[in-house]
A protein has these predicted regions:
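Amphipathic alpha-helical segments enriched in hydrophobic/aromatic residues interleaved with Lys/Arg
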Residues: 115-172
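Conserved small/polar residues in nucleotide/adenosyl-binding loops
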Residues: 178-180
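Generic detector of well-ordered alpha-helical segments enriched in charged/polar residues
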Residues: 7, 11, 29, 109, ...
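A short, N-terminal "cap"/entry segment at the start of jelly-roll beta-barrel domains
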Residues: 1-27
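Acidic, proline/serine/threonine- and glycine-rich low-complexity intrinsically disordered segments
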Residues: 174-176
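N-terminal regulatory/effector-sensing and dimerization cores
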Residues: 25-121, 152, 158
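Hydrophobic alpha-helices of bacterial signal-transduction systems
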Residues: 6-7, 67, 131
Length: 180
């Protein structure tokens, strides 16, 4: 898919104050982050839900509530809103490329209700999907389409965002059921 159409940031430095701000002028944001010189983030949390898909370079190490998660290229990690975490981006390579999807809590909750997923266990904790299921269900293409949907007129964009987030939620829920 056309990753070049996703907004790209190189060595972006995130502050705790920036992380605590909600999404501005959108309910969903997709960005492509490359870290080379800036190889770690501050400990932070967000008022929105965040998914990270490493697409090239290094494995990423996330520290969350005393636990360590190694997220390899092709895997997907989900952070519920308000979860404190920090990342180190150069574990086994000198750079890291990641697609980062940020979803406003109001949009998240509306999609969860509409898809009748109020009891989906994965939504309440850190969740990591392996590269095989990420490739099978082509999450990278879904996330690139989400980024491209920013170009739609506002009223249409919100409807498309709801459809895309609902699709993602249903797929992750089904993947969880298949692996139980």
């Amino acid at each position: 898919m056309e990753i070049e159409r996703v907004t790209h940031y190189v060595d972006n430095v995130l502050t705790q104050a920036e992380a605590r701000m909600g999404l501005r002028n959108t309910r969903l944001l997709v960005a492509w982050y490359t870290n080379q010189k800036n190889d770690q983030s501050v400990v932070h949390s967000h008022p929105y839900h965040e998914l990270v898909l490493p697409i090239g370079g290094s494995t990423v190490r996330y520290s969350i509530d005393g636990s360590v998660y190694l997220v390899h290229v092709g895997e997907l990690i989900y952070f519920p809103a308000q979860i404190y975490h920090a990342g180190i981006f150069n574990i086994d390579n000198d750079h890291s490329d990641r697609l980062v999807i940020q979803i406003d809590d109001a949009l998240w909750q509306a999609c969860r209700r509409n898809a009748n997923l109020k009891n989906a266990a994965w939504m309440h904790s850190i969740t990591v999907l392996d590269p095989d299921v990420c490739n099978k269900w082509d999450f990278q293409s879904l996330f690139v389409r989400m980024a491209q949907s920013q170009e739609l007129p506002a009223q249409m964009r919100d409807i498309v965002f709801e459809a895309q987030v609902s699709e993602m939620m249903l797929l992750i829920t089904q993947i969880g059921r298949a692996h139980v």
